């Protein structure tokens, strides 16, 4: 099995790398057929609840569950959370939950648990659900997956400007560092690899305590996080990331007392739209639904 996996990832990497290189050389987007429908708005739900954190910034799972249910129900115009989840997955699906395990700001374990519970309640077998990050290429559930749920916290990032939903799929390639050039502008190519393409059912950008400033690789300072107490949920990863980026930028400007651009600029968000056709990054093409707590919403 190891030989087969290596052969696939090498071939897939070369295929994606060709797209990145050609796009960079000629300065043009990929073929128009890869682009999202330009006439349709992407729905993004921002849900916030100040009670999701206690005084010690520990997460209340019940409150978090209510936030998740409200967001998914609103996203799909469903009558209730159960019907929303049954529209996202079917009982015969094999679902990988792509998390993020960066130790300073990982995907909250209560959220991983909630997603797993909702998937099983929707009829997916427990043995066909797995949450993973760095071992996705070796995880048997991910190797057989028919569906993915993409969930991670937003934070500033040394190479890509922002750690985003788009960037979260970098572990689906065998050599992630090869995507660091040009502020990781080619990350969108990963989403077109055969073992990823078309599988993502839901994107959840965790904005509970996002990191809005950092200096150097793997830098983290609690002083540069804040209790935003939110989740951004969408079927469109680009629209979700663009919304989160607006919040991070607004927080930076407020904190530093003036314009303080994200550095390096998160070029991969716009490129995911204009070069790779993964969704929309433009404000006028995003339908933003705000739910819950509105104080200091920054949007």
What is the role of each PLM region?
Residues 2-299:
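N-terminal and secondary-structure boundary signal
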């Amino acid at each position: 099995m190891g030989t087969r996996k290596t052969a696939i990832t090498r071939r897939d990497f070369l295929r994606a790398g060709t797209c990145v290189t050609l796009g960079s050389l000629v300065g043009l987007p990929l073929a128009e057929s890869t682009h999202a429908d330009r006439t349709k708005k992407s729905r993004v739900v921002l849900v916030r609840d100040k009670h999701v954190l206690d005084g010690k910034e520990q997460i209340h799972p019940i409150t978090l569950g209510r936030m998740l249910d409200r967001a998914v129900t609103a996203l799909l115009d469903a009558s209730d959370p159960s019907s929303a989840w049954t529209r996202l997955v079917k009982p015969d699906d094999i679902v990988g939950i792509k998390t993020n395990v960066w130790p300073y700001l990982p995907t909250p374990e209560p959220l991983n648990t909630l997603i797993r519970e909702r998937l099983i309640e929707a009829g997916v077998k427990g043995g066909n659900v797995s949450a993973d990050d760095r071992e996705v290429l070796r995880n048997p559930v991910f190797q057989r997956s028919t569906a993915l749920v993409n969930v991670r916290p937003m934070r500033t990032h040394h190479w890509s400007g922002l750690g985003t939903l788009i960037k979260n799929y970098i572990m689906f390639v065998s050599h992630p560092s090869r995507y660091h050039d040009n502020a990781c502008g080619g990350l969108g190519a990963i989403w077109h690899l055969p073992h990823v393409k078309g599988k993502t059912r839901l994107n959840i950008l965790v904005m509970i305590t996002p990191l809005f400033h950092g200096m150097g690789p793997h830098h983290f300072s609690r002083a540069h996080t804040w209790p935003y107490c939110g989740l951004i949920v969408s079927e469109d990863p680009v629209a979700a990331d663009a919304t989160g980026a607006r919040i991070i930028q607004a927080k930076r400007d407020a904190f530093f007392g003036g314009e303080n651009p994200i550095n390096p600029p998160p070029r991969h968000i716009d490129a995911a739209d204009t070069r790779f056709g993964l969704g929309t990054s433009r404000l006028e093409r995003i339908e933003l639904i705000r739910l819950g707590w509105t104080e200091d919403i920054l949007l």
